[in-house]
Regions:
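Bacterial N-terminal signal peptides
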Residues: 12-23
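Conserved phosphate-binding loops in N-terminal lobes of ATP-dependent enzymes
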Residues: 39-146
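Gly/Thr-rich phosphate-binding beta-strand-loop-beta motif of the actin/hexokinase/Hsp70
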Residues: 36-69, 170, 174-206, 272
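Glycine-rich beta-strand-to-loop/alpha-helix junction loops that act as flexible
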Residues: 123-127, 186-191, 267-274
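Composition-driven detection of intrinsically disordered, low-complexity segments
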Residues: 9-12, 75
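Helical "lid/coupling" subdomains associated with nucleotide-phosphate turnover
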Residues: 84-102, 106, 112-113, 129-131, ...
Length: 400
């Protein structure tokens, strides 16, 4: 049975954000299937991650020397795929995930007329288990489509392209934001990040890193310390006890191998636990880029360890606008539906380790609100661009 589904309805705000980092012109979002049906430049992507399944569809076409991209559909369905047993996806989780994928797969075709051959199904690098082929089989059986998996390096590169804009619309600094910044993404299955090297070569080069622990997988790791399920206080102690070896030491080794990871002073944080922190610590700030400080991370870590239930139920009475307050309440409820209290505690430990090992004190830090869709959108756009360029070359050759 599928768990609660969240649709991201605020397409206009998201579109404004996406315009800057894809460096293309997008003028409007068409939500009606009848309008979309007239355009055959439709592509869709389905991402299977450690927290669930994300789907997106775009209308992609040539516009002058660039491209015109319109986002026509996004959806997120949380699943229990990372509730592994003996380091294997359970049959129930496999079925649940395959059903979620098939639901999006069918919707893209039926409601948005995306051609079946232009829907791509991709697994996140954070999916770790001994029976990945069983997931591929379940998805292929449900959809008739093959699926592939990204490496950490590929996912970081796509996420950087999709999260960090070349230019910030809300800033006046005359710099290439992507060549001055670094991305750190705390996913459910792993923690990864990196930066794009400055240069004028024909292709972009990146420095990437990753460790195999994210919010859910670290929750699972800390839960192994006791034969019986721990209460929240005991779990917080267990997570703290293993964090130095499991998190800090592994992050430190990555930094030692690639010291340039400490050189960037503009840091973009993404991932579900960062969204949770921004929502709970700064509920009133709903911008595309939310400014954060290391004090925010320290406070979040302290409150998660000492009174996670109070943290998950913030006082919103200071927000005078009732409409805005009700919208924020929905955001808070989404956090609670997405993460268990133990997930919040585990994620706070990862944030604390990232803060320490990447020496974030004194750096400019932002939460990238729409980073959760960044790599799948980048992937779909890349596939659409590749197909369009191939078609254009074929047309040019035929005319010679």
């Amino acid at each position: 049975m599928l768990r609660k589904t969240y649709k991201y309805a605020s397409f206009q705000l998201m579109l404004i954000f996406l315009i800057s980092f894809f460096a293309f012109s997008a003028t409007s979002v068409t939500s009606s299937a009848s309008a979309v049906a007239k355009n055959n430049k439709l592509h869709g992507g389905i991402e299977i991650g450690s927290r669930g399944v994300k789907g997106t569809a775009i209308n992609f076409s040539r516009k002058g020397s660039g491209y015109d991209v319109k986002i026509i559909y996004t959806e997120v369905i949380n699943t229990s795929i990372m509730k592994v047993k003996d380091n294997k996806f359970t049959p129930e989780a496999l079925q649940e995930t395959a059903e979620a994928v098939n639901k999006m797969f069918a919707r893209m075709q039926q409601e948005y007329q995306v051609p079946v051959e232009q829907i791509y199904i991709v697994g996140s690098s954070g999916l770790r288990s001994d029976n990945k082929p069983d997931l591929v089989s379940a998805v292929t059986k449900a959809t008739g489509k093959p699926m592939s998996f990204l490496t950490v390096e590929m996912e970081v590169q796509l996420s950087i392209a999709g999260t960090i804009p070349r230019r910030r619309e809300d800033e006046t600094k005359p710099l290439d934001e992507r060549e001055a910044s670094m991305l750190l993404d705390i996913g459910s299955g792993n923690t990864k990040g990196g930066y794009q090297l400055s240069g004028t070569g024909p292709t972009d080069e990146f420095v990437t890193m990753g460790i195999p622990f994210g919010t859910v997988s670290f929750t699972n790791e800390a839960s192994k310390l006791r034969k019986v399920e721990a209460d929240l206080s005991s779990f917080a102690l267990d997570a703290l006890l293993i964090s130095q070896h499991t998190l800090n030491e592994q992050l430190r080794k990555e930094v030692e191998k690639k010291p340039g990871l400490l050189s960037r002073n503009r840091i973009y944080l993404s991932g579900g636990i960062v969204w949770a922190m921004a929502t709970l610590v700064h509920p009133e700030n709903r911008k595309a880029f939310v400014s954060l400080t290391t004090d925010d991370i320290t406070l979040f870590h302290y409150r998660a360890r000492n009174d996670v239930n109070a943290l998950l139920n913030p006082d919103l009475s200071f927000i005078a606008d009732e409409l805005k307050r009700n919208e924020i309440k929905k955001d808070v409820e989404s956090v609670k539906a997405t993460f268990s209290p133990k997930n919040i505690i585990a994620g706070a430990e990862i944030l604390n380790a990232v803060n320490s090992e990447f020496k974030l004190q004194g750096k400019n830090i932002w939460f990238a609100r729409y980073g959760h869709l960044s790599w799948i959108l980048s992937y779909v756009r890349g596939q659409a661009e590749k197909q369009l360029l191939t078609a254009e070359r074929s047309t040019t050759s035929a005319l010679k």
